[in-house]
Regions:
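The C-terminal cap of the DNA-recognition helix in HTH/winged-HTH DNA-binding domains
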Residues: 64-65, 110
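Alpha-helical packing segments of well-folded alpha/beta enzyme cores
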Residues: 48-55, 104
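Short amphipathic alpha-helical surface patches that mediate protein-protein
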Residues: 17, 32, 106, 122-123
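Residue-level signal for nonpolar/aromatic packing positions in well-ordered secondary structure
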Residues: 12, 59, 78, 108-111
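GST-like domain detector, emphasizing the conserved glutathione-binding G-site
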Residues: 1-50, 60, 67
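C-terminal helix/juxtamembrane-tail motif
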Residues: 114, 119-127
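GST superfamily/GST-like fold recognition
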Residues: 26-31, 69-97, 102-108, 115
């Protein structure tokens, strides 16, 4: 999952750094705000959402070139980026303007062993 060729391994690394720097903070911060974990004024929330939308535009554009981030096969970069994008709804970021992202998410969800994050978290016993 780390890439097959030297070039693909380099692209995986680029995506991992991009995810950490450009995508994750700008999805998780507005998510934290909407869930009440952070108290900020509306301008701060909107700033993070706009930065997330900028990142999603980049992602959508790049995904127009192929089924996965670094080519025809999924890599750890796809898993990492998916993990952030999956929380966009909780940040009240609409993914409908990003058709390539939505299609890619569907492909990631069809990978062997895929599970939604909610299915992996411990559940409180209802009894």
């Amino acid at each position: 999952m780390g890439g097959k060729t030297t070039e693909q391994k380099a692209r995986v690394r680029e995506w991992m750094f991009w995810e950490f720097d450009r995508l994750a903070p700008n999805i998780y911060r507005p998510r934290a705000i909407k869930r009440g974990f952070m108290k900020v004024n509306d301008g701060v929330y909107e700033m993070y959402v706009n930065l997330a939308k900028d990142a999603l535009n980049v992602l959508d554009s790049e995904l127009g070139a192929g089924p996965f981030l670094t080519g025809s096969d999924a890599t750890i970069a796809d898993v990492a980026v998916y993990g952030d994008v999956a929380y966009a709804g909780e940040a009240e970021i609409d993914l409908s303007p990003y058709p390539n992202v939505k299609a890619w998410m569907g492909r990631v969800e069809k990978l062997p062993g895929f599970k939604k994050y909610a299915d992996l978290l411990p559940q409180q016993d209802a009894a």
